[in-house]
């Protein structure tokens, strides 16, 4: 009888983890996942220098933005970041 109760409790805990876990809920904020798809696309083509780089930390439709050279413009990296 005790084994049956332990088994039932274990199953409930495992099911609770699967169905109630925040990582599986599809919810979340941008702070939970820094590479989550964001629409910072307004920064694509923005002027960037070493001193003023608006591309840092920006993501456009799953592609991270970066400044290829000093005194250039923000472009998207070719590597896709799943989000």
UniProtKB/Swiss-Prot annotation:
<keyword id="KW-0027">Amidation</keyword>
<protein>
    <recommendedName>
        <fullName>U-actitoxin-Aeq6a</fullName>
    </recommendedName>
</protein>
<keyword id="KW-0166">Nematocyst</keyword>
<feature type="signal peptide">
    <location>
        <begin position="1"/>
        <end position="20"/>
    </location>
</feature>
<keyword id="KW-0165">Cleavage on pair of basic residues</keyword>
<feature type="modified residue" description="Proline amide">
    <location>
        <position position="82"/>
    </location>
</feature>
<keyword id="KW-0732">Signal</keyword>
<keyword id="KW-0964">Secreted</keyword>
<comment type="function">
    <text>Toxin.</text>
</comment>
<keyword id="KW-1015">Disulfide bond</keyword>
<dbReference type="GO" id="GO:0090729">
    <property type="term" value="F:toxin activity"/>
</dbReference>
<feature type="propeptide">
    <location>
        <begin position="21"/>
        <end position="36"/>
    </location>
</feature>
<keyword id="KW-0800">Toxin</keyword>
<dbReference type="GO" id="GO:0005576">
    <property type="term" value="C:extracellular region"/>
</dbReference>
<dbReference type="GO" id="GO:0042151">
    <property type="term" value="C:nematocyst"/>
</dbReference>
């Amino acid at each position: 009888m005790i084994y049956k109760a332990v088994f039932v409790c274990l199953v409930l805990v495992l099911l609770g983890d699967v169905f109630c876990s925040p990582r599986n809920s599809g919810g979340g904020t941008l702070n939970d996942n820094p590479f989550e798809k964001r629409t910072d696309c307004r920064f694509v083509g923005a002027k960037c220098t070493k001193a003023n780089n608006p591309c840092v930390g920006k993501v456009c439709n799953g592609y991270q933005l970066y400044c290829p050279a000093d005194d250039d413009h923000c472009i998207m990296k070719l590597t896709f970041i799943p989000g």
